[in-house]
Amino acid sequence: MRNKGLSFYKKKKKISQELLREIFSWIFGIALSVLLAAVVVIFLGKSTRVVGMSMEPTLENGQQIFIDRFLYVLSSPKAGDIVAFLPNGNENSHYYVKRVVAGPGDKVRIADGTLYVNGQESKWVTERILDAGIAENEIILGNKEYFCIGDNPNNSEDSRSANIGPVEEGDMIGKAWFHLKSGTDGIGFIK
């Protein structure tokens, strides 16, 4: 018979199969969620960086943003949306990121540094605009045309510029909806 005194051997604890199943179930669920999120972002979204200071203070130069490419398949852009587009559909250009301030059928004019849409002062541009560009004379937007301008209008090449002009809906990549950290700005949804 064996003495029940000191024993230098540890008893091995068995891990139950139920616990293993639970652990693998969690790992599989997390991995599947990450994979599904990646597929959604890759196929329905796009990632790009803001070029220049035209969208400050909302977005900073070099800030990474995510673009929803699917939204405008179901609906049209609205005033206030921040969109990414290729100017005049130029595939060789970087994406321009600007705010929609007017849509199809709207009348746009910049007078005395103020942006007017349909005769009303725009709530989207509060800074005095130094260069009216082509909007010095009233522009009536055509079907599926949008007037887009940077939140920092005096440091922005946008729809006021003759080489960009009103943006065609077909040239829009999608709506910017999320940004990553840049400088002091944290991650979050774009307003």
For each predicted feature, which ranges?
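PP2C/PPM family metal-dependent serine/threonine protein phosphatase catalytic domain
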Residues: 117-133
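Short, surface-exposed secondary-structure edge patches
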Residues: 54-58, 71-76, 99, 105, ...
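Structural motif
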Residues: 63, 78-82, 106, 145, ...
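Beta-strand-rich cores of mature extracytoplasmic or soluble domains
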Residues: 135, 140-191
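Protein maturation boundaries and topogenic segments
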Residues: 1-93, 167-191
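Short aromatic/basic micro-patch
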Residues: 49, 96, 109, 140, ...
